[in-house]
Amino acid sequence: MPALRTIQARYTLFLVLFIVLMLILTVVGISQLVAPKLRHTEEQVALNRIAEVAQRIQGELNKVQAQQRSITQTIPLLDSDSIDKVLPGLVDQYGEQKVFGGGIWPLPGQRTPGRNKHSTFWHRDASGKLVVNTFWNSDPAPNYYEQPWYLGGMQTAPGQCAWAAAYKDDASAEPRTNCAMAIRRDGQPWGVATIDVTLGFFNDLVARQEQ
């Protein structure tokens, strides 16, 4: 019996050691082979999601640029009164809420001879409705044609947006950017058109992607 117990003890010991060895090899195998592949897969999935969101964002910005091209080619065909009537429809885009507003900003004397500032700017109020804003035509307002966004827009190639750095003011709870694009009449500089875009739609795209 003692010999049998000794043999059983040895087998038990060998079995325990074998199990421990297999556990060690399994852990090492997972850490060395499986885990890196899992991390790579997770990283690739994350990168693919980021790329998809970036592509959608670029698509939304391209829509704004296409909208702006329509505006900058339409405005030179209109007289001053017609600009005020037509512009809200060009800006609104059937109530597209990411478009906070938009305007046209003629160079001094271009829209009305002898008039220094004669812009038309519409933006959304708290209910999402477009309302006209005449502040930039008032005497206390700085000259819009001297602002960085204006100068940047004047330098753009035909049909291309100059995107402003993100900013935030009291007019909206969300940060915004704007696309400024040059307007030319008869091949000569006439002014700049802007479309203000709220950046909140970035969050909406990310939220939909995470679902």
PLM ranges: what are they?
Residues 2-36, 40, 44:
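Extreme N-terminal signal-anchor transmembrane helix of membrane signaling/transducer proteins, especially
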Residues 95-159, 165-173:
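Extracellular/periplasmic ligand-sensing ectodomains of membrane signal-transduction proteins
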Residues 54, 58, 143-150, 180, ...:
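Amphipathic alpha-helical bundle/coiled-coil segments
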Residues 19, 23-26, 53-56, 60, ...:
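Histidine kinase transmitter module recognition
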Residues 87, 164-165, 204-208:
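Short beta-alpha junctions and helix-cap segments that line functional grooves
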Residues 47, 51, 58-100, 104-108:
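Extracellular/periplasmic ligand-binding regions of membrane signal-transduction receptors
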Residues 172-210:
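Conserved beta-strands of PAS-like sensory domains
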Residues 47, 65, 84-88, 147-150, ...:
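Extracytoplasmic/secreted envelope proteins and their assembly/folding machinery
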